[in-house]
Amino acid sequence: MAQILAPSIQCQTRITKTSPLATPISSKMWSSLVMKQNKKVARSAKFRVMAINSGTINRVEDLLNLDITPFTDSIIAEYIWIGGTGIDVRSKSRTISKPVEHPSELPKWNYDGSSTGQAPGEDSEVILYPQAIFKDPFRGGNNILVICDAYTPQGEPIPTNKRHKAAEIFSNPKVEAEIPWYGIEQEYTLLQTDVKWPLGWPVGGYPGPQGPYYCAAGADKSFGRDISDAHYKACLYAGINISGTNGEVMPGQWEYQVGPSVGIEAGDHIWASRYILERITEQAGVVLTLDPKPIEGDWNGAGCHTNYSTKSMREDGGFEVIKKAILNLSLRHKVHIEAYGEGNERRLTGKHETASINTFSWGVANRGCSIRVGRDTEKNGKGYLEDRRPASNMDPYVVTALLAESTLLWEPTLEAEALAAQKIALKV
């Protein structure tokens, strides 16, 4: 992100009642996605034309786009949680008797954890606690998406529930006083369904070298714009604090930015945005991957750069606070790397706008460093830092909480601090 501005004033865990005229993302948008993708989608389009002749698709689409708001007080709540891999999103729907404005108004629910790799078959019940709600861009009306975290029946967070610990860190008085802001740059790659090869690439072959694809326009340079744009609009509709999107360096790869968000909201909004993206690619007949290095060779990987600032960093003299934070991050480099995403060693090679995974570095305007500081921050003497190490498949609850913990709660010894400052050429 070019800069971190003030967070939106909208309450990120509340939702207002929508107008009865509110509608979900139109069927025309989904149709355009379906008609423009890979061979499988072409076959689907052929079936679609045949089905339209019999009226089947028209009747189904009428029901899919039906706004139930004028006809019932009940709403549909889509409960969303993180599955057993720590990166997959799962969901199921239930009827709620009336519109809600806050997750505390929603009931807890349960699911079969043995089917998601999160519980044994003989004791498979996992409990969902609603934590944040968003408007549903697929169903429209007063219907909602519900971000949940997962617990045992005894109330203990299950191992894949990283939100629980993050919430504890963000509720620490020292952290709350600093009002941590996050701007997260989520990169992702679109794959052709049948062959698991990037969208726009010749099957079994490669496009021309990187260079013409970043932020490009044109049928020979930009692949998947409809999906990116549909996702952008769906996130805005949902109330996600999405701030931008762009085509990436590798063809078939895209990025969107979420933030600035305060504390735990950053993780909630990233997970909600990922779920929406999964649903859109599902309807478009395209596969979404968050693999940090989907294609080996001279191609950029996919990251999740995390921009971070505290109240002290944003005030006059904040650059000195930023440098102290960088010092702490250098001393905990291995801790962060271990928590920054699976397969990240394939991406952090020191090439393709990355630093080496084994070496901590920082610099002003240097995209080959672990931590980048912008020119404006250096010039103004205050601002934010960008952690370029997180992989595209990182857990935002883990990354955001760890940044706060390392820079606001963890204190190194003076000796370790002095040695680290000398090692990374940092005057504090």
Curated annotation (Swiss-Prot):
Residues 159-428 form the GS catalytic domain. Residues 75-155 form the GS beta-grasp domain. GO terms for cellular component: chloroplast. GO terms for molecular function: ATP binding; glutamine synthetase activity. Its EC number is 6.3.1.2. The keyword Cell membrane does not apply. Its main location: plastid. Signal peptide: none annotated. Keywords: ATP-binding, Chloroplast, Ligase, Nitrogen fixation, Nucleotide-binding, Plastid, Transit peptide. Belongs to the glutamine synthetase family. The light-modulated chloroplast enzyme, encoded by a nuclear gene and expressed primarily in leaves, is responsible for the reassimilation of the ammonia generated by photorespiration. Homooctamer. This is Glutamine synthetase leaf isozyme, chloroplastic. It comes from Medicago sativa. The gene is GS2.
